Amino acid sequence: INVGDGDTAHTGGAVWENAVISTAIREFVYRGGGFIGVGEPAGHQYQGHYLQLADLIGVEKETGFTLNYDKYNWEEHKNHFILADTTKPVDFGEGKKNMFAYEGTEILVQRDKEVQMAVHEFGEGRSVYISGLPYSFENSRILYRSILWSTHGESLLHQWFSTNFNVEVHAYVKNGKFCVVNNTYEPQNTVIYRGDGSSFALKIEANEIKWYAV
């Protein structure tokens, strides 16, 4: 996961001029690993690119050097696994401007022809791009689904899982216990999935914590 503005310590800055580092990341993802970039991941103007992993991420920032490139990929894929639990337009906070997608990249959200969220397959691996992700219960679910999708872990979704993103499941398998936590000041209804995939419906009161045996 690489998060932050370009040319900062958070994303790496000039470190990305080191081919050993960029090659290692590409090799990791190409062989089946996952990559999540938020903001301007690997952002540093060098050798004609701003995002130094643009080929991996499938997204690049327009900084004036590619104005003459045709940019036809703007179709949104709103039914993607990552967006399945969203209840409203995704909150990207400040987001990022001038981001465009390469051909072969799936755009999940674009606004005024500026990419806000996209996914891309790179070899056997996958990457997720998000322009910004301020904390909220809904965005936390988006991040969780992004992690699962980028690591080919979609089948693991319904393990220690709450269908309502306002409610969390914490499993302490070695101790034989798990708890369900309502993070809100209102009662919530949800379906809880255990580690084996079995489930049960639950109504949980405001701020309530319920404990169960595994």
Regions found by a protein language model. Give the residues of each.
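Active-site Gly/Thr loop motif
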Residues: 89-105
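Intrinsically disordered, low-complexity peptide-like regions
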Residues: 83, 89, 96, 180-181, ...
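Compositionally biased, intrinsically disordered low-complexity segments enriched
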Residues: 4, 82, 96-99, 118
